[in-house]
Amino acid sequence: MTVHIHPYVDNGVKQGSGHFAGGTLVCKCHDRPVKVAVKGDVAHNHACGCTKCWKPSGATFSVIAVVPRQNVTVLENGDKLKIVDPSAVIQRYACTGCGTHMYGRIENTGHPFYGLDFIHPELFQEQGSAAPAFAAFVSSVIESGVKPEQMGEIRARLKELGLEPYDCLSPALMDAIATHVAKAKAA
């Protein structure tokens, strides 16, 4: 039995073009879709198992990446965007029509990822953004209904796809968080 991770990666991870200049994210609405422009390529693209990230129907994981917040602009139908959970660290702006999360923003200037917006690269109209490179918060899929006994198969499938599974973020991102905290303590 094939383990389904996310439609964006289930048939193999497609490598990015290496020169993606950005594009337009489009929600799933047929009438007045929300459109968001993103300048430049994405960074830290990964499969995420947390229960906060938006997942398309049938997906076990989301696919999420970051871009500088100044590179994100709502182009059309921004009146349809609403923050999903105002108490969350990442303010996820979702379309009120279809529920698609268009971008997530951190407003806390003391947060290690302040200045980066979280986006779902599979929503790009254009092809070629950087490919997912790892899987984060893998065990968290249990919280969304995956049976614990399926985790071995899920981790094996992630590895087969070239997405190293972590139960937190990747080592590079965890190092960035620890560095930020250490600098803040030293200040």
From Swiss-Prot:
GO molecular function, one term: S-(hydroxymethyl)glutathione synthase activity
Cofactor note: Binds 2 Zn(2+) ions per subunit.
Binding annotation for Zn(2+) 1: C27, C29, C95, C98
Cystine pairs: none
Database matches in PROSITE patterns: CENP_V_GFA
Pfam families: GFA
Pathway involvement of the protein, from the record: One-carbon metabolism; formaldehyde degradation; formate from formaldehyde (glutathione route): step 1/3
GO biological processes: formaldehyde catabolic process
Residue intervals of the CENP-V/GFA domain: 20-167
Source superkingdom: Bacteria
Cofactor(s) listed in the protein's UniProt record: Zn(2+)
Enzyme nomenclature, EC number: 4.4.1.22
Xref: PANTHER family: CENP-V_GFA DOMAIN-CONTAINING PROTEIN-RELATED (PTHR33337:SF40), GFA DOMAIN-CONTAINING PROTEIN (PTHR33337)
Task performed by this protein: Catalyzes the condensation of formaldehyde and glutathione to S-hydroxymethylglutathione.
Family to which this protein belongs: Belongs to the Gfa family.
Protein name: Glutathione-dependent formaldehyde-activating enzyme
Species name: Bradyrhizobium sp. (strain BTAi1 / ATCC BAA-1182)
